[in-house]
Amino acid sequence: MQRKHNKDIVPTAKMLRKNMTKEEKYLWYDFLCTYPVRFSRQKVLGKYIADFYCAEAKLVIELDGSGHYTEEGKQYDEKRTAFLEEYGLTIIRIPNMEIHKNFRGVCEHIDHLVEQSLSQLR
């Protein structure tokens, strides 16, 4: 993604990295931080902050808590997704409950998407 990011939200991203949700911690420490392709946490992309971002695979992972299911949350997520997709990024949304109920399946799904993306980009 070549577009400049909003420097005003960098402090917010840093704060979010220090105060991850339990689902973000679980996915990060038990899977993404040791994944063979590099992921970043709370990455500023344009005017938004992505929960997890893999530049090499052009993949954004968003973990969705209850706030994402309100009408306002859904509208915000739609705008954000459209903005990020303009830059060729793939956005996947994972409900927080899925992290608890099917962690292995979530990891396998992410792995599949990364491999698929990398094979298309090569």
Which positions does each model-derived feature cover?
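Nucleic-acid endo/exonuclease domains
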Residues: M1-R122
